[in-house]
């Protein structure tokens, strides 16, 4: 992450602008802190990774999920590859291809002026979607990719994956989905895969995604929901419950969408996963 990238961030406590205080490594952030110009709070940066999390405000459920994902991080990719086909009835790639078109990346067009387009993945995890973004984006388009996660373990796996990535760089940071460290309306696409069912406050998480998305842009959320066609199957009920042990009811959070959400589509993309797409219209619409 460069100094210019850091200028696109905002204080997660007050949303004020941040200034970097510390050392640089080949023009990228090294170690130091991002200090808020408004509230003067300092947010640490270690080895180029900003940590923009107010730990006192992280919900208990999210703390638990962070510990779980930190522990599972080294096993996440191989276990997913092995178990996804027999449980989901399709390959991992086919399931991801079920929601990627909802981002409508091919319809992106350059902004007026020199500002690049920006795409945010909330809960980037081990970075499995990064190559799919690169695949679906127009090649000559100036696009910044941003990814955040609460789990240091998953971000470490993501950074390892990106060492071999030959496309656009992914700007990574540690952050809480309930308090995204960005100004309002600064992303041209926002999406999240596989975590909102474990959020302490899903309504707040959806509101934050909507806040940082530009008006009328697709916001795509994917997580666990048992396909109605398999709800009478004891096997699938047991397996789904094991997969979602942390949540009393894992369903598409349509009821938690921000007021005024339009273009709402909730669909099943595999046996155990839904895809929810919505937009927030312009205020003058």
Model-derived regions, located:
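Conserved class I S-adenosyl-L-methionine
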Residues: 53-113, 128-132, 136, 154-157, ...
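Short beta->alpha hinge that forms the Motif I/post-I loop of the SAM-binding pocket
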Residues: 150, 201, 224
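A short glycine-rich, Lys/Arg-flanked "PGG" loop and its adjoining helix->strand segment in the class I
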Residues: 203-215
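C-terminal alpha-helical "lid/dimerization" subdomain adjacent to the S-adenosyl-L-methionine
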Residues: 220-277
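A short SAM/SAH-binding and catalytic strip from SAM-dependent methyltransferases
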Residues: 189-201
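N-terminal auxiliary segments of SAM/dcSAM-dependent transferases
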Residues: 2-67
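A short acidic, Gly/Pro-enriched loop at the edge of an enzyme's catalytic core
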Residues: 178-190
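Class I SAM-dependent methyltransferase SAM/SAH-binding core
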Residues: 118-179
């Amino acid at each position: 992450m460069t100094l210019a990238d850091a200028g696109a961030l905002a204080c997660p406590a007050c949303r004020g602008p941040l200034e970097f205080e510390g050392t640089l490594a080949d023009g990228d952030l090294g170690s130091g802190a991002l200090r808020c110009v408004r509230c003067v709070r300092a947010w640490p940066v270690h080895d180029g990774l900003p940590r923009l999390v107010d730990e006192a405000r992280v919900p208990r459920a999210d703390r638990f999920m962070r510990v779980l994902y930190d522990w599972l991080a080294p096993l996440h990719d191989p276990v997913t590859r092995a178990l996804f086909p027999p449980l989901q009835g399709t390959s991992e790639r086919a399931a991801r291809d079920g929601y990627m078109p909802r981002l409508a990346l091919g319809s992106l067009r350059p902004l007026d002026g020199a500002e690049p387009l920006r795409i945010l993945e909330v809960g980037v995890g081990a970075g499995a979607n990064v190559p799919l973004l690169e695949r679906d984006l127009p090649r000559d388009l100036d696009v910044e990719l941003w990814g955040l996660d609460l789990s240091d373990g998953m971000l470490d796996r993501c950074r390892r994956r990106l060492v071999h990535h030959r496309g656009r760089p992914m700007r990574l940071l540690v952050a809480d989905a309930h308090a995204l460290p960005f100004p309002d309306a600064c992303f041209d696409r926002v999406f999240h895969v596989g975590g909102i069912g474990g959020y302490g406050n899903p309504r707040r998480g959806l509101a934050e995604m909507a806040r940082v998305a530009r008006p009328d842009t697709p916001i795509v959320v994917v997580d666990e929901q048992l396909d109605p066609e398999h709800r009478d199957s004891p096997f699938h009920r047991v397996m789904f419950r094991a997969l979602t042990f942390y949540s009393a009811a894992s369903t598409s959070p349509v009821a938690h969408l921000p007021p005024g959400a339009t273009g709402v589509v909730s669909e099943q993309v595999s046996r155990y996963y839904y895809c929810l797409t919505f937009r927030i219209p312009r205020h003058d619409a």
